[in-house]
A protein has these predicted regions:
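Terminal helices and disordered tails flanking the catalytic cores of nucleotide-processing hydrolases
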Residues: 1-120, 297-416
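Short secondary-structure boundary/hinge segments and terminal tails
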Residues: 63-64, 198, 215, 255
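Generic secondary-structure boundary/loop-capping signal
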Residues: 8, 14, 31-33, 152-155, ...
Length: 416
């Protein structure tokens, strides 16, 4: 790496940016490590008060030889060992076997969300521009191929347990955007849903960390204290005057329920923000399929069943429950199924119009032997071998000792 610090006036398209003299959360850019592609980007940087930048001449253009930079910090080219954090970022942005879009979008967004929560813990609320940049990046990919990004969420669920607030925030954001699109919301409202989902648990940073970790097991005074996170989040985010009112309402009302059993204000259906209800139902689903502390995760199909029952009890509007199930499927991505043929299959996609007939990857034959090459089949379409396959029941991957993730990873190149 060969870096140089130069004045913003010396920056031109074709240079590779690695740092600026303004904190990332005070700019509208998701990342400062990027190729500068046009003059408009440079003008925006100037508008946000950036005066000095650092470029990497090994990845982009250098200054003309006749130009003397204000300060130079040349480092010898060749192999260097980057700091741990920087190395992690570079690995995450390298092509990964053709599945770069979903993997990289998710990894970049996760890194940005982690920075937001780190700043929140220091009492620094994110700018609306920084939050919107993350959401817009994810939304573009959801609009382009929701299967790939939903699969990435499923893979993360399988590979990890007891995930951090950032993991839950990002997954809730992705799934909320999918539901918002399925609900027919216009893009400005989709973005507000995504921003609210990303920040819905911001108030937890103001509560004891050990209490937050066991939040699903608390009762009494601890539970009452945890329920304050909605108001604490609004207070924290309101310190930035530009945060949209609808985003703040999502943060405040995502635990409200249509039957009045929610918190913090026990609002009824007609008083709850519809955008907050979207984030609320996704929040419940994501919590159910995530292992936290001693509480095991539900398999996705069982979580969908619980959502249906919640709709029957009046906790969520039935049309919203229907939209949620249509979005993620009766058998969500990552579900392990037993087919009527005796074969096992992993769900790799959903059919919104035929929710009982997902896209699957058939992994074992009727005798339980593994197929050398799994069969990718749309259960809603006629089979080439004229075999009629239907879902017999849902299996628990843990009990079956099946690593579902290894069957999901290879679909990313195809889906992306």
């Amino acid at each position: 790496m060969a870096t140089k610090q130069i004045a913003i006036e010396q920056l031109v398209p074709g240079m590779y940016l690695v740092d600026v003299d303004v904190p990332w959360y005070r700019t509208p850019f998701l990342f400062h490590k990027r190729m500068v592609n046009d003059l408009q980007t440079i003008e925006i940087m100037k508008q946000y008060g950036i005066r000095m930048v650092t470029i990497d001449t090994s990845k982009g253009a250098d200054l003309p030889l006749t130009t003397t930079p204000s300060s130079v910090n040349d480092q010898p080219a060749g192999p260097t060992v980057p700091p741990p954090q920087e190395a992690q970022v570079e690995r995450a942005t390298e092509p990964v076997l053709g599945c770069q879009p979903a993997v990289v979008i998710y990894a970049q967004a996760k890194e940005a969300v982690e920075r937001i929560f780190d700043d929140l813990e220091r009492g620094v609320p994110p700018t609306p521009e920084a939050t919107k940049a993350i959401v817009s990046n994810v939304l573009d990919h959801v609009l382009n191929d929701r299967v790939a990004i939903a699969t990435q969420v499923a893979i993360q669920k399988i590979k990890q347990f007891d995930r951090s607030l950032t993991g839950h925030a990002l997954d809730t954001c992705v799934l909320s955007l999918i539901v918002a699109i399925e609900s027919g919301l216009e893009q400005p409202q989709q973005e507000l849903v995504g921003m609210g989902a990303l920040l819905h648990d911001a108030g937890y940073v103001r509560l004891p960390r050990n209490l937050v970790r066991k939040r699903d097991e608390c009762s009494g005074q601890d539970k009452t204290l945890l329920e304050q996170h909605c108001k604490l989040g609004v207070t924290l985010l309101s310190e930035h005057p530009g945060m949209h009112e609808d985003v703040l309402r999502i943060v405040l009302e995502h635990h409200e329920r249509t039957d009045g059993t929610g918190f913090p204000a026990a609002l009824g259906n007609d008083k709850i923000s519809p955008l907050a209800q979207i984030v609320g139902i996704v929040d419940v689903y994501d919590a159910m399929v995530t292992r936290r502390g001693t509480r095991p995760a539900l398999i996705p199909h069982d979580a969908v069943r619980q959502l249906f029952l919640a709709g029957e009890r009046g906790q969520f509007p039935k049309p919203l429950v229907e939209t949620m199930i249509r979005s993620i499927g009766v058998y969500p991505v990552g579900s392990l199924l037993k087919l009527n043929t005796g074969e096992q299959a992993v769900v790799v996609g959903v059919n919104p119009q035929q929710r009982l007939k997902p896209l699957v990857k058939v992994t074992t034959d009727p005798q339980g032997g593994s197929y050398a090459t799994p069969l990718e089949i749309d259960l809603a379409a006629p089979s080439s071998d004229h075999t009629v396959r239907t879902v017999l029941r849902v299996l628990d991957p843990i009990h079956e000792r099946v690593n579902v993730a290894i069957h999901l990873d290879p679909i990313l190149p195809r889906a992306a």
